[in-house]
Amino acid sequence: MADLSNERVVYINGEIVPESRAMVSFRDRSFKYGDGAFDMTRTFGHRIFKLDEHLKRFYKSLKYLQMDPGMSLEKMKEISEEVLARNLHLLNEGEDYWVAQRVSRGVEPVGGDIHEAAEPTVVVECTPLPFKARAHYFRDGMEIVIPSTRRT
């Protein structure tokens, strides 16, 4: 069995698993139709920044989309903090994470009604902030393109 002490873990659908074992079905509505919502915040000094505010906004978005995450805001907060805690040992001093919560309506039944209720897909994960890889953007700036076609 592989040594997983150097692999980040992720919460997915009720379990905390190594990232290498975290799978989302290709039939998940978020993959097929973009039918999902997410929120992301970062850590400062290994603490999640304004998590309560982010989760309130996230749950407001879920309500607007009529998407039930299958858990309370308090439970999502608890999971977010646990996932972070289980991944902190992988950071060096001065490094931090993005912490993301993602919810979709889940996997729709093949040949079924697209409005049929499914179990939501819920993911909470941490990704290291790429400070070193992006330092040159802060130092040198970056080119951008502004399309002439305006969207409303």
Question: Would you name each region that the model predicts?
Answer:
Residues M1-T152:
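Conserved alpha/beta cores of soluble small-molecule-handling proteins
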